[in-house]
Design a protein with these regions (language model features):
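Eukaryotic basic, amphipathic alpha-helical target segments in cytosolic regions
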Residues: 36-40
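Short, charged beta-turn/beta-strand-edge "cap" motif at the junction between a beta-strand
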Residues: 81-82
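Short acidic beta-strand-loop surface patches of small beta-rich interaction domains
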Residues: 42-67
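Short structural boundary motif marking the start of a folded domain
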Residues: 1-5
Length: 82
């Protein structure tokens, strides 16, 4: 099964396909921040200090995606500047 996670950075949302989801959650934030920069004319969003669920519950950046996140879930990147 291939997992898809919807990652929000500021006012943008990126669907990230993770394959079997063996990556760490930190990888999701890295991919989302690179996409944000690419699609916003090089605008640097800054560094991620964490991620959270829609409920506000924090996500451990060292979790393995497939162990803790469900397919098609929405998560938000928390930026150091926020």
């Amino acid at each position: 099964m291939s997992l898809k996670v919807n990652v929000h950075v500021r006012d943008q949302m990126y669907s990230i396909f993770c394959g079997p989801g063996s990556q760490k959650v930190r990888w999701l934030s890295d991919v989302a921040l690179h996409r944000y920069e690419h699609f916003n004319n090089g605008s640097d969003p800054g560094l991620a200090k964490g991620m959270r669920f829609e409920t506000g519950v924090l996500i451990d950046m060292e979790w393995t995606i497939s162990d803790k996140l469900e397919n098609d879930v929405h998560v938000w990147v928390i930026l150091k500047e926020d």
